Amino acid sequence: MTPLHGKTALVTGSTDGVGRLVAKRLAEAGFHVYVHGRDRKRGQEVVAEIRSKGGAADFQPADLSALAEVKGLARAVLDGTDRLDLLINNAGIGSGGTAGVRQTSRDGYELRFAVNYLSGFALTRLLLDQ
């Protein structure tokens, strides 16, 4: 058993890429991992992969461009565990897509600002306040 066995982590943006790899590595090290993303199918695939190798994981969906969903994610994680030992704010969106067209979140913020900055700050504060 490692010193990390039984610890709990939330990795945002962990249904693909770096976040997925980090979630899998944390589970291998003994963490119970909350996998996060927007796509339920991909989230469940990551959870199934972790569990198939003896790890512990759950999926929590949320669209981080909406502050209400950020709050819901924090609430779901806090309701599911006694403590959160590690938060990795990995989720983000790039600059691809509709060039020159202003995109805003449901809350009226610039989309990339909402996802890449506000959501991480808000999620951290919500989890720290508990």
Model-predicted regions and their roles:
Residues 40, 60-75:
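The beta1-alpha1 cofactor-binding region of Rossmann-like NAD(H)/NADP(H)-dependent oxidoreductases
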Residues 124-125:
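A short, exposed helix-loop element centered on a Lys and neighboring polar residues
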